[in-house]
């Protein structure tokens, strides 16, 4: 069974850079560490830009399946996590639903929320990376803007806190300091035995 470490945050937080950046030092310590890219990117390239909250279900299922299939490795570092899909669905809640449509949305959200909560236990360490660290252009697939990323950031943060998810919020800004901070947390948590050379 692998050690599973997830970096979660909105677009522009730098979570992918951090997830990729922590893998190489672990490999140099002879740890079988693998970076796992967010399956939602592949889904959106295949299906086109996000258009309906029900798309969060296949994204959740594909991400969960990927998380299970990679377990033969020693150490997995993700730039997202399956449970994030519930925060996305909450963020994508349409504001102009009639009563029947609202009931359908609430049913779907409760279902995905329950599945997402169960997946949280899959991870030994979660890093929350706040947005706003890097300037945003338009994402070619999600078409995020600054205010949208900030809104998702608030929803995701609230989701973690509401479910008492244990996570470490990355505080550093400089990339080397961030990697040092992350590796210190991994060592303190007993997930690595020594600090890598950064």
PLM regions with names:
Residues 48-97:
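Conserved nucleotide-sensing/catalytic segment adjacent to the nucleotide-binding pocket
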Residues 15:
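Conserved lysine of the Walker
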Residues 165-169, 176, 180-198:
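C-terminal accessory "lid"/substrate-recognition subdomains
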Residues 7:
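Hydrophobic anchor at the beta1->P-loop junction of P-loop NTPases
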Residues 12:
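Walker A (P-loop) phosphate-binding loop of P-loop NTPases
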Residues 18:
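Hydrophobic positions on the alpha1 helix immediately C-terminal to the Walker A/P-loop
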Residues 92-174:
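A glycine- and Lys/Arg-enriched "phosphate-lid" helix/loop adjacent to the NTP-binding pocket
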Residues 23-64:
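Conserved substrate/cofactor phosphate-moiety recognition/catalytic segment
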């Amino acid at each position: 069974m692998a050690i599973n470490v997830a970096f979660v945050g909105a677009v522009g937080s730098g979570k992918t850079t951090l997830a990729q950046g922590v893998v190489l030092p672990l490999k140099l310590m002879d740890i079988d560490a693998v970076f796992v890219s967010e399956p939602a990117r592949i889904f959106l390239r295949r299906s086109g830009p996000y258009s309906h909250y029900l798309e969060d279900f296949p994204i959740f299922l594909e991400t969960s399946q990927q998380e299970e299939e990679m377990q033969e490795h020693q150490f997995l570092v993700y730039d997202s996590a399956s449970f994030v899909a519930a925060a996305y669905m909450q963020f994508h809640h349409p504001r102009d639903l009639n009563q029947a449509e609202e009931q359908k949305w609430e049913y779907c959200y409760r279902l995905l929320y329950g599945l997402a909560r169960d997946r949280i236990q899959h991870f030994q360490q979660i890093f929350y990376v706040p947005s706003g660290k890097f300037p945003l252009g338009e994402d070619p697939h999600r078409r995020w803007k600054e205010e949208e990323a900030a809104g998702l950031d608030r929803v995701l943060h609230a989701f973690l806190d509401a479910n008492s998810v244990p996570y470490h919020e990355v505080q550093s800004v400089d990339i080397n300091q961030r990697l040092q901070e992350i590796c210190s947390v991994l060592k303190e948590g007993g997930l690595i035995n020594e600090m890598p050379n950064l």
